[in-house]
């Protein structure tokens, strides 16, 4: 009887010890629970509860009190973590721009302005240099620079091969000469009486042209007058 009583007392003490071990982290006055932060305490408590729940379910004869205790603990943790998750995150205030950022922004603005001015100058220069210009080839000292044709003489200019002035040679040159000005200067004294009056307007009348008979007559008159005006010689 005595041995049985001792054995029963020992079994009661063994049952109390696991309960004390399992319930110490539920006491908020415990030093380990009080020193731990709320988030760390909740996470550690949740991990321990889940671990004990799985351990109890793996046993062949699970303890009902232990399961109820673990489930209540999990519900309490879930209720305490729900308001914290429901609260929206507090937006952090925007950081004030530092002096280095202001300097970088000003330097970037100055650099962009200088680049824009350089691009405008380059586009202006490209617009001016769009017309192709012949390159100056370097040749002997006697040769003109830039591919210019050498100086031609008068005969070379008149020649048909050059094509500078004429294409038909000297005959075309004489055909193109207008001799009317020379005729007017030659017969100007004789034809003064035939000139029209002063020009009154833009529609002036041209001087009548003289035919060959009139020219011969004028020549005879001029020759006769010159003979009459010539003084006789001393022997006559």
Swiss-Prot record:
GO biological process: positive regulation of cell population proliferation; positive regulation of transcription by RNA polymerase II; regulation of cyclin-dependent protein serine/threonine kinase activity
GO cellular component: cytoplasm; nucleus; sarcoplasm
InterPro entries: E2F-SERTA_domain_protein, SERTA_dom
PTM (free text): Polyubiquitinated, which promotes proteasomal degradation.
Composition skew (Basic and acidic residues), residue ranges: 197-207
Gene Ontology molecular-function annotations: transcription coactivator activity
Highest taxon in the source lineage: Eukaryota
Any Pfam family: SERTA
SERTA domain sequence ranges: 38-85
Keywords annotated in UniProt: Transcription, Transcription regulation, Ubl conjugation
Disordered, as annotated region: 1-20, 189-211
Quaternary organization: Interacts with the PHD-bromodomain of TIF1, TRIM28/TIF1B and p300/CBP. Interacts with E2F1 and TFDP1; modulates transactivation activity of TFDP1/E2F complexes. Also interacts with CDK4.
PANTHER family, per the entry: CELL DIVISION CYCLE ASSOCIATED PROTEIN 4/SERTA DOMAIN-CONTAINING PROTEIN 2 (PTHR16277), SERTA DOMAIN-CONTAINING PROTEIN 1 (PTHR16277:SF12)
Role according to the record: Acts at E2F-responsive promoters as coregulator to integrate signals provided by PHD- and/or bromodomain-containing transcription factors. Stimulates E2F1/TFDP1 transcriptional activity. Renders the activity of cyclin D1/CDK4 resistant to the inhibitory effects of CDKN2A/p16INK4A.
Name assigned to this protein: SERTA domain-containing protein 1
Organism: Homo sapiens (Human)
């Amino acid at each position: 009887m005595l041995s049985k009583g001792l054995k029963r007392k020992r079994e009661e003490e063994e049952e109390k010890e696991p309960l004390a071990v399992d319930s110490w982290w539920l006491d908020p006055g415990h030093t380990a629970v009080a020193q731990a932060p709320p988030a760390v305490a909740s996470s550690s408590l949740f991990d321990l509860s889940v671990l004990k729940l799985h351990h109890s379910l793996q046993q062949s004869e699970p303890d009902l009190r232990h399961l109820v205790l673990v489930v209540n603990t999990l519900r309490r943790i879930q209720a305490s973590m729900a308001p914290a998750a429901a609260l929206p995150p507090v937006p952090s205030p925007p950081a004030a721009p530092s002096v280095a950022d202001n300097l970088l922004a000003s330097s970037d603005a100055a650099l962009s302005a200088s680049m824009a001015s350089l691009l405008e100058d380059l586009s202006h220069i490209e617009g001016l240099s769009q017309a192709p210009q012949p390159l100056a080839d370097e040749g002997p000292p006697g040769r003109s620079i830039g591919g210019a044709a050498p100086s031609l003489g008068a005969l070379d200019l008149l020649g048909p091969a050059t094509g500078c002035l004429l294409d038909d040679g000297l005959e075309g040159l004489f055909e193109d000469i207008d001799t009317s000005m020379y005729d007017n200067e030659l017969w100007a004294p004789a034809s003064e009486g035939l000139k029209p009056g002063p020009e009154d307007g833009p529609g002036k009348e041209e001087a009548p042209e003289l035919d060959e008979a009139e020219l011969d007559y004028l020549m005879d008159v001029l020759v006769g007058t010159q003979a009459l005006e010539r003084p006789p010689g001393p022997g006559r």
